[in-house]
Amino acid sequence: SMVCIYTVAESWLNDRSSNKNRGSVLSVYMVILYGAMGVGMFLLNFSSPQNFQPFILVSVITSAALIPILLTKKKPPTFKRIKAMTLKDLYEASPFGMVSSFFYGTIQAALFTLLAVYATSMNFTIFEISVVTFLLAVSGAVSQFPVGKISDMYDRRLVIVISTFGAAIFALIAILVSRQMYLPEGLATSKTWFYIFLILFSFCSLPMFSLILAHTNDYIPKEKFVAAGAGLQFVFGLGAMSGPFLCSIFMDMVGSNGFFLFLFFFHTIIGVFGIYRMKVRQTVDNPDSQFVAMPQTITPAGIELNPQTEPIQEPVSISEPIESVAEPDNENKN
């Protein structure tokens, strides 16, 4: 159901956007999405998560979000069929893009699903859990732009490798900081340090899907950008299905800190595979491919907001054909 909501919302945005403002619309959409994701966690403080009221509140807010679309008198957007790329074609175009998208889906699903579980096991209060999730989302939104700018200047694979190893290092540091939380109150390390390293981790990790998408676009023609994005989203979803399950195994084997150990392990896999791909394949300079910040929940309809994709066929005003017809008549009269 959430996928349907994303698809409808992004199709409306795409239909109402022009070739001049698609990038701006996508940026605003991404900031709102991450911001709402972070702010939404504070709703847990209004009622105990063990009660049914939070679920009712989420249902009401979700329904209210659709009211502007339901009340509009404008014609709904039409869906056009996208010529999909097979997974084989996608892998041949960008092995690193496809493989890293799968593992990053595993990371993201575990991160947003089990972060609250980890924080609860570390004796965080509900308000502190809200702060943790808020910092994670906001830091991820802010990091998109500087990281994306750097990726347009250098080999994107190098930027991805540095980002993944950076996230892995900060995940390990978060383990060392969190272990101090079990000490008596007088000796306990302030949770502020945990917040700081979580922000740094998010800064390195959350721009990853946009980087992967931009890297894949470097190796394909412009007319296949949307199809490739849809394929990467599918592979991302396959990885996401296994993320929470695998992470829970790590946490069951080594305790709560298995959460960050899991994040360290899978970020390292992406980084190592990126180094391998840099040795076997040279980078290319595709002028049609540039970094555009995108959330990992983006749908094919939303990918069309990417200003690097094919231009939107904007409607021609009715006055133009009338004028073009009237001009020959005037000439004949003269």
Q: Which residues fall in each region the model found?
A:
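A membrane-interface helix-boundary motif in multi-pass transporters
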Residues: 46-61, 249-267
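Loop-to-transmembrane helix entry/capping segments in MFS-fold secondary transporters
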Residues: 19-29, 126-127, 220-232
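C-terminal ends and interior cores of transmembrane alpha-helices
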Residues: 166-186
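Intrinsic disorder in cytosolic terminal tails and internal cytosolic loops
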Residues: 79-84, 277-334
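Structural signature of the two symmetry-related core transmembrane helices
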Residues: 59, 158-173, 264
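Intracellular juxtamembrane helix-capping segments at the cytosolic ends
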Residues: 4-17, 206-220
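C-terminal membrane-cytosol helix-exit motif in multi-pass small-molecule transporters
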Residues: 44-45, 59-79, 270-278
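Helix-to-loop junctions at the C-terminal end of transmembrane segments
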Residues: 48, 143-155, 251-252
